[in-house]
Amino acid sequence: MTRFIFITGGVVSSLGKGLASAALGALLQARGFKVRLRKLDPYLNVDPGTMSPYQHGEVYVTDDGAETDLDLGHYERFTGVPSRKSDNITTGRIYSNVIAKERRGDYLGATVQVIPHVTDAIKEFVKSDLTDEDFCLCEIGGTVGDIESLPFLEAIRQLGNELGRARTMFVHLTLVPYIPSAGELKTKPTQHSVKELLSVGIQPDMLMCRCDREIPEGDRRKIALFCNVAPDAVIPALDVDSIYQVPISYHEQGMDAVVCRHFGLDAPLPDLKRWSTIVDRIRQPEGEVTIAIVGKYISLLDSYKSLAEALHHGGIANNVKVNLNWIDSQIFEQGDVVQHLEPCDGILVPGGFGERGAFGKVEAVRFARERKVPYFGICFGMQMAVIEAARNLAGYKDASSTEFGPCDNPVVGLMTEWMKGNMLEKRAASGDLGGTMRLGAYECDLKQGSRVREIYGQGRISERHRHRYEVNMGYRADLEKTGLSFSGLSPDGVLPEIVEIPDHPWFVGVQFHPELKSKPFDPHPLFTSFIAAAVRQSRLV
């Protein structure tokens, strides 16, 4: 029997509902429960796949090929439970499904309305694809009071009535701001946020109050009194130095104990040793390295959320602090490469789309190759590494990607077909933008004796992809003559997945996104190895 915990947010956006949900999931998991986490997004897009990174941030890709909200990355990193397509829904997808049913006649001529048809579709999603999970935590995107979120709030209100308190719990995350001129915390925004939630029929069972300092006992009791919750169910969500300290902080505030009491569960205390170990390593590093991230969406760092976390995971594994130097690739198109990159111990070029800033990334690759600085190219970063080698080593001075327009030497081109298991998948360049991607987990065979095979410690791996362009195998022979090794291929040998330069301290480009599978307690081997190479570069060891 799965129990449902619904997490809502109020007062302002960006309070950290995703992290709060992930941390609560980790605490319940540490008590021995099996958990599942889901995100309900109120926006009208079908998925975030075609949204601007500046608008939405990172698109998190699951093994089964769903393009989802970045909060699912938090869920996976904190619990280790792989997210699935059924763990993220948007208003756009809900309405698409409802309209499709209406067109098929599934509603038998009824007038299709938000209640009950849209709310029923939301409830169906919440309860679907669950087996033996003890808890399903559902985060409702947006802020209470938004027009877009009303159908979702109504749906979870109905679920609360249908399933009863024995199987449902409502958690509300609010802000308790400190007013310097008054010298005190203010509880009124929280009171009004709960009032707004009550207006749609939801009484929260627990309040998580974001604040930058301890909430005095008197203020906690005041919030409890006016918001109709138990005093110990007012949980201060204090600012902490590292997000991986959040589960420890929430446990110290009694959050998981309140949840267990609500459901009448007698569970053992959580084992938080691995979180304590992670926090200790973050607080007491034995050195530090600086990694240059040469990207194009750096004005919104959420665009690279999983990437930044994976680099920090590599730092945890090597017991060093990782400083990230974010650099807009466009500045390298006018020069200044040495000035920006010389102080760095490693260079990483992440994924991206489009020509803007692309050849600045090529210059960053050239610097890393010629100066023997550890280089890690991910997705677009691998393609730029191949273009750099084709131009400066193989003699194809006009080598480019068809993504940027027609060219005589397209060393990178649009994929039109590939194998997924025993099935041939095809895409057309004229198809919908959201339907032309190679998405999800695909296997890759690693070359015997290669650096990546040594790093992974196995011959076949599975990694997550999100791309529509691929390195052209027609140039493989000429590129390998220059010293660029194609060390990872799809099992059918058609698609190049990894390139490396054996005669280099550390130079690896991958077509997939390894950052999506990295966790603080299980760092991805490529990031662990890359940071180790950066440590050697910095002469720390």
Curated annotation (Swiss-Prot):
The active site is at C379, H513, E515. Residues 1-265 are annotated as: Amidoligase domain. Pfam families: CTP_synth_N, GATase. The keyword Ligase applies. SUPFAM superfamilies: Class I glutamine amidotransferase-like, P-loop containing nucleoside triphosphate hydrolases. It catalyses: UTP + L-glutamine + ATP + H2O = CTP + L-glutamate + ADP + phosphate + 2 H(+); L-glutamine + H2O = L-glutamate + NH4(+); UTP + NH4(+) + ATP = CTP + ADP + phosphate + 2 H(+). Its EC number is 6.3.4.2. One of its GO terms (molecular function) is CTP synthase activity. UTP binds at S13, K186, T187, K188, P189, T190, Q191, K222. Keywords: ATP-binding, Glutamine amidotransferase, Ligase, Magnesium, Metal-binding, Nucleotide-binding, Pyrimidine biosynthesis. CTP binds at S13, D146, I147, E148, K186, T187, K188, P189, T190, Q191, K222. One of its GO terms (cellular component) is cytosol. Pathway: Pyrimidine metabolism; CTP biosynthesis via de novo pathway; CTP from UDP: step 2/2. CDD domains: CTPS_N (cd03113), GATase1_CTP_Synthase (cd01746). Catalyzes the ATP-dependent amination of UTP to CTP with either L-glutamine or ammonia as the source of nitrogen. Regulates intracellular CTP levels through interactions with the four ribonucleotide triphosphates. CTPSs have evolved a hybrid strategy for distinguishing between UTP and CTP. The overlapping regions of the product feedback inhibitory and substrate sites recognize a common feature in both compounds, the triphosphate moiety. To differentiate isosteric substrate and product pyrimidine rings, an additional pocket far from the expected kinase/ligase catalytic site, specifically recognizes the cytosine and ribose portions of the product inhibitor. This is CTP synthase. It comes from Paramagnetospirillum magneticum (strain ATCC 700264 / AMB-1) (Magnetospirillum magneticum). The gene is pyrG.
